[in-house]
């Protein structure tokens, strides 16, 4: 399965489809993963990571590309070292925490 690089408009569409289906979703932000060295990567995830990713040179640039309606969850000690943060829907965050 290879990554499909999407832009901010496509990310809004992917996220809207997940919201309509009422599934838990989020964007996993990584820095410098082996398949995209030196880049920040936002990977869309539902029950599992998907093929949809956005790429940027900086964290701020990538955060600006994320669709609206998200809440940031900081990196947890159990996360792999390349994970920087995870963004969940605000509704999901209220249910989880």
Each language-model region and where it sits:
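A short, structured beta-strand/loop element
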Residues: 36-51
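Cysteine-rich, disulfide-bonded extracellular modules and peptides in secreted proteins
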Residues: 51, 65-67, 81-88
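Short, Lys/Arg-enriched charge-dense amphipathic segments
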Residues: 50-51, 57, 94-97
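A short, charged, amphipathic alpha-helix used as a generic interaction element across diverse proteins
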Residues: 52-76
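Generic structural motif
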Residues: 32-34, 47, 59, 91
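Short N-terminal "domain-start" leader segments
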Residues: 2-39, 71-75, 81, 93-97
